[in-house]
Regions:
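Generic recognition of short, well-ordered alpha-helical segments
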Residues: 19-23, 51, 84-88
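Aromatic- and acid-rich polysaccharide-binding/catalytic face
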Residues: 31, 43-46, 139-140
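Generic detector of short, locally flexible boundary/turn motifs and exposed helical patches
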Residues: 2, 34-37, 71, 89, ...
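Glycine-rich anion/phosphate-binding loops
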Residues: 19-20, 43-57
Length: 140
């Protein structure tokens, strides 16, 4: 048996429920693997962020989620928004997730965490940073 203690599963792919989401979460829980989830956000307003939170909440309602619900903020559609606008969007998502009894976090790449997002404006102070290895010849 692998020593996998948890997974973070994506919820959306190309605007719809990830086609592998239900199978992945069912297999993980059946094998005693703790589960968290994330959504790659396309939200450019607080209303859109709440809609994304509701999308996630509807998906996970029947599953035992024991790890965070992450809001992945790094899409180019959000790139020209101010730090205050981005914080308001993140806070809207996190408030909705927290109110439903889950633990929200922010997920972003290093550039976004260091230059685009101001964590001091966020209602949560925890982030999850992607760390990609440098692979010669690969564009990332």
């Amino acid at each position: 048996k692998d020593d996998i203690s948890f997974v973070m599963l994506g919820t959306r792919s190309k605007g719809a429920v990830d086609p592998y989401f239900h199978k992945n979460i069912q297999n993980a829980t059946a094998n005693g693997v703790k589960v968290g989830v994330y959504i790659y956000s396309l939200a450019t307003t607080t209303d859109m962020a709440v809609q994304e939170a509701d999308f996630v909440l509807n998906l996970i309602t029947d599953y035992p989620i024991s790890y965070p619900v992450a809001f992945d903020m790094e899409d180019s559609t959000q790139g020209n928004l101010s730090k205050s606008e981005l914080a308001a969007i993140a806070n809207a998502f996190c408030k909705r997730i927290s109110a439903a009894g889950y633990y929200p976090i922010i997920y972003a790449n290093e550039n976004w965490l260091n230059n685009k997002l101001d964590m001091s404006q966020m209602i949560i102070q925890y982030g999850w940073q992607d760390i990609l290895p440098d692979i010669p010849g690969k564009i990332r």
